[in-house]
């Protein structure tokens, strides 16, 4: 294997000899820990299993909930910080013959994030129209997505923190990094997964709490782009980045007082 024209040793080649790097053949999920304790583990685990099945991966018998919680719990105890997330990437090994039985490996990284379960900061969005995201079963999981890469560069070039991605029907799907929640009156509107929204254990935990405690009505919706301007408040929840209040879309600004109060109450239950 060569890198920039230079021959790599066999050991150096190992870093690139996987289908995640060569083919984008991987799925990604995020486990969470707070005060050195893994939380929402079961929800994230089942999302990982579902993502791997959708990608037709050969799930090892060792990939149990107990297996992941044990290795993560041990690793967390050795960290110099208490709060954050665990980025897990499952990928197929490169073999001469590719099949659904190709062995699967996983790597994980522990990332510090002290404000993961509270609103980080205000962000500015706009709608990107020249690309769209799909609405099939692979659109809801974290796998290789060139649309995200394009949109991230677009956001940087236009001094935006994120963008609203539409589906082929010109309806709101999600943002680059996560899902959008629109508060109108006493109703939180969330784009349906069939619209291209991500499956998000973090968001599901929040809206389940809101629903059970009757803080607001939850409505799964199909929304045209213009309807974002009707919202009283907008929240973006990302399993990787955390929680952000959308304070501006084009010329309209949004407050965040009600969402802030809901997030604060929900955060206290995550123990």
What are these regions (language model features)?
Residues 66-97:
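Short, acidic/charged, Gly/Pro-enriched secondary-structure junctions
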